[in-house]
Each structure stands twice: as C-alpha cells, then as structure tokens.
Swiss-Prot record:
CDD domains: HAD_PGPase. This is Phosphoglycolate phosphatase. Belongs to the HAD-like hydrolase superfamily. CbbY/CbbZ/Gph/YieH family. Its EC number is 3.1.3.18. The active site is at D13.
Length: 232
C-alpha cells in the first residue's frame, strides 16, 4: 500500500493484537473479586475491559460488582490481581494465529520491531519469553515505563526516540481505539485488527489507515511477500 511505503519500523500492541490474554486476565480478576466475596465476572465480560492497564481493569471490575470506588479498595484489589495474575499470565495466554511466523518475516527483512503495551511492565517479559517471541523486539515499553499510557502518544514518542525514527516511518498495529488514537496523535500510520479487544466496537470506527482481519495480512499490506507466497 502506498501509504506504508515510508515504513522503516513496526510496533505492536500486545493484548488482543499479538496475544489472546483474556483467559489469564479473567481468571486473575475473578479470583481477586472472589477473595473479597464478590461474584466472578467471567472471560466474556472481562475481555471488554481490557486495554487501559491493570488499574482501569480493576476499577471496571469493581464498578461492575457494585462496589463504591475508593483508593484503598482499588489498591487492595489491584494487589490481589497482581498476586493471582503472576500465576495465570503464562498459562492463560496464547499467540493469535501466525503471529510468530509474521514477526519472523519482519525481522528477516531487517525491520526493527517495537512493543508498546499498557500491561504492567513486570508481566511483559516473562510472557513474551514463554511464548517464544521475546527476541523479535528491539524495544519493549510496558505500562510502568511511562507516566501516561495509550491513548496518549507518549509511549510512541518514547519508542520513536529509541529507534531513531520519524513518526511517518513507524507503523503501529493494534486492536483497540486506544492504539489507533495514540498512533494518530503521534503522527504514525496505523493498522487496526478486527479480532481483538475493543470494548465491543468495530475497530473501523476509529478510522485506522487500514483494517485487517488476520495478523499475517500485515506482510502484503506493507509490501512484503505473504506467508503463503513464501511457502511456494
């Protein structure tokens, strides 16, 4: 696509883009709620709360459970969530189809690859390692590495500086409006994926430069051979 001809690097969101992490997140939230005598929300509902970081995830869970928000309750529930998620993050997460093969092709073509996630930083590296994709990333920016998270463009500015790229040279790929808003605010071209966690909204409503239904479609979108072509 002409709009992606200047691309010299690609950055990705994590949850809902590279990794289906809803099962592990839901288990941790439900155990944190149960510890306080509250009902379990379940994976289908928790998946609609993903994308703004752990604090917001906890706040949404407490609001759903009908508990009044206060700093002490949020802090206590967040501590419980962290405790349980440390046990569920790896076994409760799996790569979406063709993610690893696509990352491998991007790397083979000399493109630096970055990761920008609102997920708490301590959980990121162990998850990437367990899934076998950690070595593909030149720069990883977690939720604790910046003062403000996506949809603010600050994490993208930080990544651009670390990679030495101009905004127009870095493609950002994500599954939620927070990803698209952050990319647009930073001046980066962006691709929205239809299969992730976007609060029940179609990603097209956020007006990314391109919408893809399959992760591997990224390769031909930026002018590289598709995985099928490489198998011939």
């Amino acid at each position: 696509m002409v709009k992606f001809k200047a691309i010299r690097g690609v950055a990705f969101d994590l949850d809902g883009t590279l990794v289906d992490s809803a099962p592990g997140l839901a288990r941790a939230i439900d155990m944190a709620l149960a510890h306080q005598g509250l009902p379990a929300a379940g994976e289908a509902l928790v998946s609609t709360w993903i994308g703004n970081g752990a604090d917001v995830l906890v706040e949404r869970a407490l609001h759903w459970a009908g508990r009044e928000h206060n700093a002490q309750l949020v802090a206590q529930t967040r501590e419980l969530f962290d405790h349980y998620y440390a046990k569920t993050v790896e076994q409760g997460s799996q790569l979406f189809p063709q993610v690893k093969a696509t990352l491998a092709q991007l790397a083979a073509n000399g493109l630096p690859i970055g990761l920008i996630t609102n997920k708490p930083t301590p959980f990121v590296a162990p998850l990437l390692t367990s899934l076998g994709i950690a070595d593909y990333f030149s720069v990883i920016i977690g939720g604790d590495d910046v003062v403000v998270k996506k949809p603010h463009p600050a994490p993208l500015y930080l990544l651009l500086g670390k990679l030495g790229l101009h905004a127009r040279e870095m493609l950002f790929v994500g599954d939620s409006r927070n990803d698209i808003m952050a990319a647009q605010a930073a001046g980066c071209p962006c691709i929205g994926l239809t299969y992730g966690y976007n609060y029940g909204e179609a990603i097209a409503t956020s007006h990314p430069d391109c919408v893809l239904a399959h992760f591997a479609d990224l390769l031909p979108a930026i002018g590289l051979p598709s995985l099928k072509d490489q198998e011939v």
